[in-house]
Amino acid sequence: MSQCFAVKGIGGADQATLGSAEILVKYAQLADKRARVYVLVSTWLVVWGIWHVYFVEAVFPNAILWLHYYAASYEFGFVRRGLGGELIRMLTGDHFFAGAYTVLWTSITVWLIALAVVVWLILSTGNRSERRIMLALLVPVLPFAFSYAIYNPHPELFGMTALVAFSIFLTRAHTSRTRVILSTLYGLTMAVLALIHEAIPLEFALGAVLAIIVLSKNATGATRRICTALAIGPGTVSVLLLAVVGRRDIADQLCAHIPHGMVENPWAVATTPQRVLDYIFGRVESHADYHDWVCEHVTPWFNLDWITSAKLVAVVGFRALFGAFLLGLLFFVATTSMIRYVSAVPVRTFFAELRGNLALPVLASALLVPLFITAVDWTRWWVMITLDVAIVYILYAIDRPEIEQPPSRRNVQVFVCVVLVLAVIPTGSANNIGR
């Protein structure tokens, strides 16, 4: 059988590689050659991470897609997605672009910090083992991780960070009072983030419920129900408030408020593979006035209510969206399968923790349905579902005895193949491929 990486027989390492390998040898009592494999994989991740950042910033910049999330404000009334723009307007005045880019990169930074904390917890929890190294190296290449932050920096990165923080703190909470306080803080955070993007509380309700059930060890059923209500209730109320009293007749006023400024817009010329290459290699240029682009492509949507949005999704139809749905489902299955393969903790063991508490996850899952009904970003919703399950699965797995088991040579080979490939392919860029 072909092998992506020869685990045995790696030689010629330089001094830096040897030094890093020695650290891994001491960490998990690895053989020198096996340790060098992980050092080389780590180096591969760093190199490709730098390339992805360079590609997004210098080769194919698409910030115009993400700045528009902060275009609306409360200057003309209470409107959905208005909080981000309102904060920028209050803090930066006429310097919209400086403020918007700051918020954009803040969302990316806090999410990458959250991922770094998860990696650190994987390596520092329990006894040192080789599988911990493998799991720590797997995390950055998952669909919701590094490439998602770089290629798809939606405002939900703030919600993703909040979910990770909430899940981690729950693993440290040992009393009902602490869990109730954490759930209250998380719920209030979701209520605020709903004012930046109305999907955020719905996207992460499932993750919060799974964390409460699985990671709150020895919690009573009553405590879990109270924590669930506190964690998902405030955000849900915010979403309903936006649906009921948020202004819908505001597109023209918002358009008049949007600042002018030229921004790179590669999508205007990226109509064929050849045109994409022409843009990448600098043979053609493409800029758009931010004001004109937002007024044409974004502000008209602020006049739509939820029913009209659902009708538009119905017009697109399930057949057209099936590819996006299938790709997202593939991400979910592949992610959970790789976590199981690397950690050696069976998926059934993880889901067995839900036995007797299925009503709460089902309720949280029901909150995801409006997302699929009112928006066509079906791959994106599946990536968020993947995060909901994966982050709790990972934090659960690192406390299990199975992760201390030494991997077989084949385990390492498969792991290396997968990570090397996923480092190159930015799965997080698949916002809605397949539609």
Swiss-Prot record:
Major location (coarse): membrane
UniProt key word Nucleus: no
UniProt-annotated location(s): Cell membrane
Membrane protein topology class: Multi-pass membrane protein
Chain ranges passing through the membrane: 40-60, 103-123, 133-153, 195-215, 226-246, 313-333, 358-378, 381-401, 414-434
Record keywords, A-Z: Cell membrane, Membrane, Transmembrane, Transmembrane helix
GO cellular component terms attached to this protein's record: plasma membrane
Keyword Transmembrane helix: yes
Stated name of the protein: Uncharacterized protein Mb1527
Native species: Mycobacterium bovis (strain ATCC BAA-935 / AF2122/97)
